[in-house]
Amino acid sequence: MRALIATVGSEGDVQPFLALGKRLLAEGHDVVFSASDSYTARADAVGVPFVGRPTWNETEFQANYLRIISEKNKLRQLTVVIEFLAQEQRSAVPQLMALAREADVVIHSPLSIGAVAAARAVGTPHVSVHHTWPLRRARGHGPTNVNLGPVGNALAWSITGSGIRLATDKLLNPVVAAAGLPPWRDILFDASHSRLLNLIAISPHALERDPLFGPTYRNTGYWFLDEPGYVPPDDLAAFVADEPPVVIGFGSNNGFDAHAVTKQLLDAVRGLDRRVVLQSGWAGLGDQELPPHVFLADFVPHGWLYARAACVVHHGGAGTTAAAFRAGIPQAIVWLQGDQLHWGRRIAQLGVGPPPRSQHALKAGWLRGALDSLLNNSDMAARARVLGTAIREEDGTGMAVRAIEKMFTAR
């Protein structure tokens, strides 16, 4: 089987797809991976054949991310995202069509509109992949996953769907047209779902399967990209060797006052009898003098760092949350946008962390209390360990490969 994998987004969006590509290759299939050419080195490092797209560099991505975060109106925020996405996806269509013609299946993220258009234009079946619950009209909940009752849910979906469609179809139909197809309606909903197979790359231990999803939706478990060859800097390895540290980092979150946030973080951990690894992230945390028990780090693979940590405070990205689940450590979420609040709430529901906090409301006092729970609540720690054991026993990429193979042979 020849698979084309296409995705968009940041490092956290790309890594799970690289994990799937690596597993497909190990199972004897052919793979071509298409994403921003800024990930060429990452793909080469794990041995996944890669065709880069000249889309954006990290500086451009961060600039657009800041535009998104600065928008207070949620519909306008979505429009900014789609404007950015549509430009990139339209330019990618010729490459994606050429690759899709040579593929037996196209595997894509929900926002890879160009890949879906290319697949449908050339007649190649496509499989959608989700790292949080797919956005779909369901009777059991409204657009924000709150159950408003059958009538309320239907009304909320109608209003929300109309607003999204009016704001985004006009921006995304040029992507569809670039593939030689007539205009689509409701593109964001339509392109993010496959009529054949939709893989939900989440552990059922972390989030139970929605009973309203039909047989074309498969909950596979998480897809982790292990990096056994990672060698940490000597000073970091020595810092974490004596005792498991607290890890604090907000990943690709940006658009807040990093200096002020760093001050709040340092105030919270000043008297803490525990070492702290502070990850600078895209925002550039740690831009001031740090006490001896705080180590400033840049990128460190979650699999390596979290396995050595006591707990983690992070932004609530789906991939970061999954990595902390897998490590079996308590976690607290300081959220900013997207599905981060959802994951923060889910962590609290599972009892492996305190209720989430908004980035804009982050104060040292709250963080001190959160760290006290993370470090000293034995029941919370026990639940996190049990969850971690269950997730480590799963084979998410293996289940995904088997589901794709079954779909392919059944056609």
Explain the meaning of each model-derived region.
Residues 48, 122-125, 274, 329:
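A short helix->loop->beta-strand "cap" motif at the edges of active sites that frequently abuts
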Residues 34-40, 110-114, 203-207, 280-286:
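Short, polar loop motifs at secondary-structure junctions
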Residues 1-11, 15-32, 38-49, 80, ...:
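Nucleotide-activated sugar donor-binding and catalytic core shared by glycosyltransferases
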Residues 39-41, 57-61, 128, 133-139, ...:
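Short gly/pro/ser/thr-enriched loop/turn and capping motifs at secondary-structure boundaries
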Residues 205-311:
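Donor-nucleotide binding loops and adjacent catalytic segments primarily
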Residues 49-103, 158, 172:
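Phosphate/nucleotide-donor binding subsite
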Residues 87-156, 205:
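Conserved nucleotide-sugar donor-interacting segment of glycosyltransferase catalytic cores
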Residues 34-36, 53, 109, 129-132, ...:
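Generic beta-sheet signal
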